[in-house]
Amino acid sequence: PGGSGRELIWFPDPVGPRDCYRAALPDPVLLHHAFPEVGRITARMAATRRDRLTAPLPMLAPSHLEGGPGAVRVEVRGRRDGVEDVVVLGASGRPAVAAAAVAATAVEWLLTGRNRVRGMVGLAEMVEPLAFLEDLAGRGLEAEVFEGDRALA
């Protein structure tokens, strides 16, 4: 259920590590439609204990216009060439600027006929992912790959 399952997750700078909880978001449904062979898709959202405590209450003060820096992180686990593998990608930036870059790039793809399918689909089904990420990088929104060693030195 949404709000359970606390986990410390690392996001790209300047956001860094955040406590995250399962979130009742539509993203897993859209992703499952695009990738039906995937066994489990979950969504998590960063929140402080105060955020979780006050979530059901009405807001007494308006939130910030944009909310400050934001980040997204995608972790994919599975087998590649018979070996268990984990790939973690992320991006950070001002949420409104990032959303505008994604929307503008998607519209550009539609207008130039670069979309893979027609009709009502999610973005993951519409575009070729690597080429889309390259176009986003051209607009200043770059994906980052988390690399590291699991062993502690």
Where are these regions (language model features)?
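C-terminal catalytic/substrate-binding lobe primarily of soluble NAD(P)-dependent oxidoreductases
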Residues: P1-A153
